[in-house]
Structure formats: structure tokens, C-alpha cells
């Protein structure tokens, strides 16, 4: 596994290229024909960077922690680097599984702990490149009724996951709001299991920027003020000021290199 990771990282150094391009979404128009959930997600991925995600090396910081992601064809390597004093902890999730290293030394973990770390690493990387990832095999998409938020019309898509391939948190449920004109992802909500029951979050995208042709956003992260909310209705609850700002999800120092085939 260690040699596999080193080979991938070395390959990136020799095969990356910079392309200072941006995505032109001005020609995207609304469609009179009925679009499916897959159609909407595909168009959203396209205006967010499309196939470039599949051949990319990303670096960013989130809450003073370093993250790196390498995607090349059907191979991937997702890394979290925790730095303290002179020590560095590397959490690595790839096609072959999860591993942790303390500097250069492999750390053997109990399965339950390893799964917790794996889910944590995967979650940050998952949100960082949305809507990319919504066409994974374990994803199930359902088109809900259109909705208007703050005067803009949105397609609304619900996402669930198969247990097989859906990860540790396969029972989580997501709802995504895509602008009907640009197909960009502006809002999302999700439910998750916690000790006290079902938790919910709603996120509002802001600070859109394209880095080497890939779209990145930050999020205002909201929680419900009380119990009894319905996940699919959080867009309206947000518009009616029924949600409370909990935190901000900000990706800093984002770098993108595109990889040659």
C-alpha cells in the first residue's frame, strides 16, 4: 500500500498541467422538456468542471487541516494531514482501503476506529467537490417538485445510498437544489443519525470561484432550531428564517492541477 501511494504521488509530479480556464455557463438555457434527476446532476457536474474532476490533483486547507485528493481515471487517493509540532499524521483513503501513518510509520487501528477516521476523511472530500460524486454507483437519485428560494427557481433532487458501496454513513439522506437556469448547486440539506436521534443540516453556497476550471464554493452551515422539521422542507424553513447559523464551511488555499492521460 505504501509503495502504491508513493507511486501515485510521484506520477502526479510528472503528469500535472496548469490550465487557467473557466467554465462558461452563459449559454445554458432552461429546457421545456422534462429533465430527469440524472439529467440535472449531469448538467450541474458539467458546469462545475465535468470530466476534469476525474483527472485532477487537489490541495486545500479546512479548519487548519491539510487535505489532498488525487483522482486519475478510476483510481483515487484522499488524504488528510494533521500536523502537530514536528509530527504529521497521514490519513489515506484509496481504492484499496484506509490507512493511517504517523510520519512514515504505519499505525494499526481497531476496525471501528478506522471506520470513523475513514468516514471523516471521506466526508470533507465529498463536500469539497460537489456535485461531482453524485453519479457514483451507490447513489440513488429522485426528482422532487421544483421549488423557489429567494425568488429563484430550483430543481430539487433527493439522494439516498445503497448499503453496498455507500460507506459508513449510507443511511444519510441528502436533498440538493440546482438553479434552473445555470444548473449550479446553490443549496443542500442532509439528515444523519446521532445518539439523540436524527440530526439535520442545511447549507447555503457562497464565495463561488473556479480554480483551473473546477468550481469551488464555501457554505453557511445551518441547523434546525427545534425538532419536528422535515428534511425536504428545509429550503422553505431557511427562507422563512427558521434555521440557525451554526458555522461556516470554508476551503482555503485551494490548488488544482490537471493530470495528463
Please provide the spans of the model-predicted regions.
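Positively charged n-region of N-terminal signal peptides that target proteins for export
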Residues: 1-4, 17-18
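C-terminal motif of bacterial Sec signal peptides marking the signal peptidase cleavage site
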Residues: 12-15
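N-terminal leader/targeting segments and the immediate start of mature chains
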Residues: 17-62
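Intrinsically disordered terminal and processing segments
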Residues: 34, 38, 47, 51, ...
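Solvent-exposed N-terminal domain segments of exported/luminal and surface proteins
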Residues: 50-93
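Short, hydrophobic/aromatic-rich segments at coil-to-beta transitions
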Residues: 53-59, 73-80, 150-158, 185-187, ...
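Flexible, processing/modification-adjacent segments and terminal tails
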Residues: 100-168, 195-196, 250, 260
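Gly/Pro-enriched, hydrophobic low-complexity segments
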Residues: 155-254
Amino acid at each position: 500500500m505504501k509503495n502504491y501511494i508513493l507511486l501515485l504521488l510521484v506520477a502526479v509530479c510528472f503528469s500535472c498541467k496548469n490550465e487557467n480556464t473557466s467554465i462558461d455557463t452563459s449559454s445554458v438555457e432552461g429546457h421545456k422538456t422534462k429533465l430527469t434527476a440524472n439529467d440535472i446532476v449531469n448538467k450541474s457536474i458539467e458546469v462545475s468542471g465535468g470530466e476534469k474532476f476525474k483527472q485532477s490533483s487537489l490541495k486545500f486547507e479546512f479548519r487548519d487541516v491539510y487535505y489532498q485528493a488525487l483522482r486519475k481515471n478510476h483510481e483515487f487517493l484522499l488524504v488528510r494531514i494533521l500536523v502537530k509540532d514536528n509530527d504529521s499524521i497521514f490519513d489515506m483513503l484509496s481504492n484499496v482501503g484506509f490507512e493511517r501513518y504517523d510520519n512514515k510509520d504505519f499505525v494499526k487501528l481497531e476496525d471501528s476506529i478506522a471506520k470513523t477516521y475513514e468516514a471523516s476523511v471521506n466526508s470533507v472530500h465529498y463536500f469539497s467537490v460537489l456535485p461531482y460524486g453524485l453519479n457514483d454507483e451507490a447513489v440513488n437519485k429522485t426528482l422532487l417538485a421544483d421549488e423557489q428560494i429567494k425568488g429563484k427557481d430550483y430543481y430539487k433532487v433527493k439522494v439516498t445510498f445503497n448499503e453496498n458501496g455507500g460507506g459508513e454513513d449510507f443511511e444519510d439522506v441528502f436533498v440538493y437544489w440546482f438553479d434552473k437556469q445555470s444548473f449550479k448547486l446553490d443549496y443542500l440539506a442532509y439528515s444523519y443519525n446521532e445518539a439523540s436521534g436524527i440530526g439535520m443540516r442545511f447549507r447555503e453556497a457562497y464565495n463561488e470561484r473556479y480554480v483551473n476550471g473546477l468550481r469551488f464554493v464555501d457554505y453557511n452551515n445551518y441547523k434546525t432550531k427545534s425538532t419536528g422539521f422535515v428534511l425536504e422542507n428545509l429550503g422553505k424553513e431557511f427562507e422563512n428564517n427558521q434555521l440557525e447559523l451554526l458555522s461556516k464551511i470554508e476551503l482555503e488555499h485551494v490548488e488544482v492541477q490537471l493530470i495528463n492521460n
